[in-house]
Design a protein with these regions (language model features):
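Jelly-roll (double-stranded beta-helix
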Residues: 1-187
Length: 187
């Protein structure tokens, strides 16, 4: 079992036309947003105004709004997002946002060879086991100083810290508000 914690202060920031994106994790390790990758998890601010999203041809996307309110237009259809609502859409889609206030979203961009086994927005206690030997499980913490246990080892996550656990034979449990993703890589 392999796992790591990406602390808030170690997240890679990059500007996009509508704000700032913070990369939580990209797979495989060593990939960049400008090179081929299998999946990328990030958060992004969306400033007030109207902005076009970057196109990711050949990828799928999951966006979960964390704060604020945003109107997304995806291929001409409007979606109104409030905190903790989500939307799946194609990375090929023409997508734009309209926000009256600064908003924050959580993003997963993933290729066809990635199977999203599960995603949860957790409010209190949570636990889970690896669902596959090729699974990558991600927990994004939304609260200050939450205690997480991975195979009986305890860690403290600060707000916006991310835990990544890969492989099989592990158990994760904890309490607090956050987002859990479980991804499986198809070979």
């Amino acid at each position: 079992m392999d796992y790591k914690i990406v602390r808030k202060e170690n997240q890679k920031e990059r500007l996009w036309t509508g704000g700032v994106s913070k990369e939580l994790y990209i797979y495989p390790d060593g990939s960049t947003i400008n090179s081929p990758f299998n999946f990328r998890v990030s958060t992004a601010s969306i400033n007030p105004g109207e902005y076009n999203f970057t196109s990711f041809k050949g990828y799928k996307r999951l966006l979960i709004l964390l704060s604020g309110s945003v109107k997304l237009e995806v291929d001409g259809r409007d979606y109104y997002l409030k905190p903790f609502s989500h939307i799946f859409f194609s990375g090929d889609s023409h997508t734009s946002s309209l926000a009256d206030e600064t908003s924050i979203d959580f993003n997963l961009i993933f290729k066809e060879n990635i199977n999203l086994l599960d995603f949860k927005i957790v409010e209190t206690e949570f636990s889970g086991n690896s669902l596959s030997s090729k699974a990558i499980n991600i927990f994004y913490n939304l609260e200050d100083n939450r205690h997480i246990r991975v195979n009986n080892n305890e860690y403290t996550l600060g707000k916006e810290d991310t835990l990544i656990a890969c492989g099989n034979n592990f158990n994760i449990e904890g309490s607090g508000r956050g987002i859990i993703l479980s991804l499986d890589i198809k070979i």
